[in-house]
Amino acid sequence: MQRRFALLFPLVLSSLVFSFHLQGQDKSADALGHPWWQHAVFYEIYPRSFMDSNNDGIGDLNGIASKLDYLQALGVDAIWIAPCFPSPQVDFGYDVSDYENIDKMYGTLADFDRLEKLGRQHGITIILDFVVNHTSDQHPWFIESRSSRDNPKRDWYIWRDGKAQNEAPNNWLSTFGGSAWQWDSKTNQYYYHFFYPQQPDLNWRNPAVSAAMYGVTTWWYKRGVAGFRLDAVDTLFEDPNLKDNPVLPGKNAYGDPNMENKYNDKLPEVHDVMKGLRQAADPYGAVLIGETWTKDVSELKDYYGTNHDELQMPMDLMLTKLKFSAQIFREHIGAVNVSGEWPTWVISNHDIVRSWNRYGDGKHNGDIAKDMAAMYLTLRGTPIMYYGEEIGMQNNDPARPEDVKDPIGRRGWPREKGRDGERTPMQWNDTPNAGFTTGIPWNPIPVTYKTYNVADELKDPNSILNWYKALLALRHKDPALLEGEYIALNQDDPNVLSYLRKTKNEAVLVAINMSDNQQKVSFDLTKEGVAMGKSNTLLTNQINLRNIATISNVTLEPFAVYIAKVE
């Protein structure tokens, strides 16, 4: 069992904040007149793993519907559901065979309609995961495309002759290992796949493809969907001349040469598609969230569009690669805010090792989980949570190659163990299978569910779950946290991340000790237009900070968080 930091310093939250309960809201705009998504809290659900309603071991839409009360009480405004469309499940749904239906393992369109309606009744809207780069090889479009060289859909995908007999058109590699070109013996050509061979890339240079895909989004908007998370947007285009990518030293987990994806990743034409998708979204007030892996803030900024006509919410996935460090986080947050755009903060998702494992030091993981929550839920911008982060769920990586379900883990073992570990079933209680199912769960549940589960944490005022609930209640309640500018404080402090969220009428101080040592800090906010008068504690996990009257000198215990209104 982890050391419960909060046993030493119990959770303190003002009664004003505790009394706040998030209610349904107008999804065209928030209370401040901004687009509804700007101040919303998003929550990613991996549908296989959230809740199983029919006890077949696989989560489903009715399972999600059964947990809307929980999500509403947590403070969630929108749920992003990973792909639930019909699929052969080669890549667990990221190989779509029909964009306008629901896979029967998850339910039916009627189940989706019920979920969407119930969600709105709970003040929660639905975001779907749109796989824009490729389809399944079982999609009717591709079945027709590969039927002959002269059929109407041949040019909907990337078909090319080889350089020579038994030689692919160029040296491009699949991100999941091996050549990115698959030979088709029926038509004697290769087709291109950035991912698995069963995931052929669409030809976005063909106007018929873009029209069809824009049409898919409209079909779902009319059904009540509030937006899309766009999968793998970087890889939509390839160099038409098929230039070889530069080869780099060394080999990857699959034994292939390392390579710079210079000619098949992040080509400028991607932004034209983002604009087209945005034009389809705007009439419905829908939001577009991008899976945007970028090397720097400048590249991330490009995805908003020069005229803010592309993605409203390109994800800052750079954050997931940073070390747990006050100084490193400060530098990155500062760079993002200097860009002038509205950030989208992500610390975990279905493709990334859980934040508990990435940021934790093996000794203070629970404390660090609270620090991370305090940071990304109080920053300027929109947060996207990942299911289970709020209870301290941990990776449960396979111990043996024969236990691996994710194909990239089977192919890349042991250097690449796959993504099974971050996709385990949600831990609802301490009964067998964590209350997820009475059947056999599709993915093993870690033994830590006996400690980290919703039912037990709801009873513990010092739990990670109640910490998240308090933070989200405060975030929804306080105008400075919703709307205020971000002002970095004490920028030379290597241990304490501190900043001000400030509007014209209000200022909130956030101070997070990211070290395992006591830290003494002082704040002079006069130059920020805040007199050194009253301070009112809003939220802390250090009991002796509850009633302090001044912030000129504050002692923060290891991993302590202090959030206060300052005047």
Give residue spans per PLM region.
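Bacterial N-terminal signal peptides
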Residues: F9-V17
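Bacterial N-terminal signal peptides that target proteins for export
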Residues: M1-F9
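Loop/helix patches that line or flank the sugar-binding groove of alpha-linked glycan CAZymes
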Residues: W37, N241, N245-Y263, H271-A281, ...
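C-terminal beta-strand-rich structural cap/linker in extracellular carbohydrate-active enzymes
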Residues: I548-E567
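Beta-strand-rich binding/interaction modules
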Residues: Q518-Q542
